[in-house]
Every structure is written in C-alpha cells, then in structure tokens.
C-alpha cells in the first residue's frame, strides 16, 4: 500500500551545505521531519553541485518519513557561472555584461532540459537564451 502524502516543501538550498538553521530547520520542523536525517542525505546527494543553490522538492508522508528530489540549479545561476559573473546587468537591454557561445548555451541546455517543460532542445535553447538576455548576457555564434 502506498504511503499517504502529508505535503510538499519546496526550498532552494546551497548544495552540500544544508544545516538545521533557517530556512531548512523551521520548514521541516513544522511537518515533523527528522531534520538531521534530511541534511545528511541532502549534503551527500548534492556534493557534486557545490557552489550552486539547488531547488529541492521534499515530499512528506503522514508517518513523518520523506523523500526528496534535487533539481538542477536555476538557469540564471548556470549562465552566470559559465560567463564568470557574480551578478547580471542592471540594464540588460543596453549594457551587455558578457558573451557566451552557442556551444556553451547548448551545454547548459543539456544540463537543464530535464527540469524544463519541453523535450525539444531547440525550444529549450530559446528559453535559456531568453534568460541570458534578461541578465545581460549576449549569445554569439
């Protein structure tokens, strides 16, 4: 028999650095989840994504057990990392702060496509390119 779901918790946590401190502790504590068990499992699963804040969806069951799914970092974070930036442009229409090649864009698309609402790489590339434009990164051939 399947477990009954109590609810979902969506958080963005620094990969490999989850601690019982806010926002993790209070969010899990409200549902009665074992916080230390989650932080150890999360840190172990995300140690290969260090340096990124990763979205995680935690499914909490009525018996206080849980499962979680770690998603890819946000597209903007991947784009800024590839361009070597700390932040985007304050005026992205006029001030371009970096350039990425089509190959770099496709590398990000291949990593991010599982979280996007499309299976078509061309459509995913347009989505990621739009995110790049909105933070002042120009895509060149």
Curated annotation (Swiss-Prot):
The keyword DNA repair does not apply. One of its GO terms (biological process) is translation. InterPro entries: Ribosomal_uL11 (IPR000911), Ribosomal_uL11_bac-typ (IPR006519), Ribosomal_uL11_C (IPR020783), Ribosomal_uL11_C_sf (IPR036769), Ribosomal_uL11_CS (IPR020785), Ribosomal_uL11_N (IPR020784), Ribosomal_uL11_N_sf (IPR036796). PROSITE patterns: RIBOSOMAL_L11 (PS00359). SMART domains: RL11. One of its GO terms (cellular component) is cytosolic large ribosomal subunit. The keyword Cell cycle does not apply. It comes from the Bacteria. One or more lysine residues are methylated. Signal peptide: none annotated. It holds the Pfam family Ribosomal_L11. Keywords: Methylation, Ribonucleoprotein, Ribosomal protein, RNA-binding, rRNA-binding. Forms part of the ribosomal stalk which helps the ribosome interact with GTP-bound translation factors. Part of the ribosomal stalk of the 50S ribosomal subunit. Interacts with L10 and the large rRNA to form the base of the stalk. L10 forms an elongated spine to which L12 dimers bind in a sequential fashion forming a multimeric L10(L12)X complex. Belongs to the universal ribosomal protein uL11 family. This is Large ribosomal subunit protein uL11.
